[in-house]
Amino acid sequence: MARLLPALLLLLLPGNVTGNGSGNGSLSRCPPGQFRCSEPPGAHGECYPQDWLCDGHPDCDDGRDEWGCGTSATPAVPTDNGTEAPTVPAPGRALPARNHGRMWMLITAVLLCCLVAVGGIAAWGKSKAKSRSDIFSLASASKELLVPDKSQADLFS
């Protein structure tokens, strides 16, 4: 019994319990690949994916997940144990994974607007050309050249 008591005490200490922060109040650390915004280290709060650090969108109430981002030096970011650790963004990764859907929606919207504009200009040009085709028709042009109007005949007399 005396041997089990220290083991039970270790299990009951909140600093030694790991979990995902999903709400029972006794969890103090986030699982690997996630971070917590709240301070001090024993505080309880939501866990966020590491991909959300320096993503241009503040997820923490105080914006600490965006602190030190975009500098030439290695930025310091909050970790699950409250200390700050340097991080280097992954090379060639401009947008976080959660924004790729928005990016494709934006690209699709811009392309659709361009297609509608080009189609509208083409339809307008076609209608203008159709309305001018009777003015420049071969039959009316040859008739005007062969039989001058009275007004044109008066000019020569």
Curated annotation (Swiss-Prot):
<comment type="function">
    <text>Responsible for susceptibility to the retrovirus subgroup A Rous sarcoma virus.</text>
</comment>
<dbReference type="GO" id="GO:0016020">
    <property type="term" value="C:membrane"/>
</dbReference>
<feature type="glycosylation site" description="N-linked (GlcNAc...) asparagine">
    <location>
        <position position="24"/>
    </location>
</feature>
<keyword id="KW-0732">Signal</keyword>
<feature type="signal peptide">
    <location>
        <begin position="1"/>
        <end position="19"/>
    </location>
</feature>
<keyword id="KW-0325">Glycoprotein</keyword>
<keyword id="KW-0945">Host-virus interaction</keyword>
<feature type="domain" description="LDL-receptor class A">
    <location>
        <begin position="28"/>
        <end position="71"/>
    </location>
</feature>
<feature type="disulfide bond">
    <location>
        <begin position="37"/>
        <end position="60"/>
    </location>
</feature>
<keyword id="KW-0472">Membrane</keyword>
<feature type="glycosylation site" description="N-linked (GlcNAc...) asparagine">
    <location>
        <position position="20"/>
    </location>
</feature>
<protein>
    <recommendedName>
        <fullName>Subgroup A Rous sarcoma virus receptor pg950</fullName>
    </recommendedName>
</protein>
<feature type="topological domain" description="Extracellular">
    <location>
        <begin position="20"/>
        <end position="102"/>
    </location>
</feature>
<keyword id="KW-1133">Transmembrane helix</keyword>
<feature type="glycosylation site" description="N-linked (GlcNAc...) asparagine">
    <location>
        <position position="81"/>
    </location>
</feature>
<keyword id="KW-0675">Receptor</keyword>
<feature type="transmembrane region" description="Helical">
    <location>
        <begin position="103"/>
        <end position="125"/>
    </location>
</feature>
<dbReference type="Pfam" id="PF00057">
    <property type="entry name" value="Ldl_recept_a"/>
</dbReference>
<dbReference type="InterPro" id="IPR002172">
    <property type="entry name" value="LDrepeatLR_classA_rpt"/>
</dbReference>
<feature type="topological domain" description="Cytoplasmic">
    <location>
        <begin position="126"/>
        <end position="157"/>
    </location>
</feature>
<keyword id="KW-1015">Disulfide bond</keyword>
<feature type="disulfide bond">
    <location>
        <begin position="54"/>
        <end position="69"/>
    </location>
</feature>
<keyword id="KW-0812">Transmembrane</keyword>
<dbReference type="InterPro" id="IPR036055">
    <property type="entry name" value="LDL_receptor-like_sf"/>
</dbReference>
<feature type="disulfide bond">
    <location>
        <begin position="30"/>
        <end position="47"/>
    </location>
</feature>
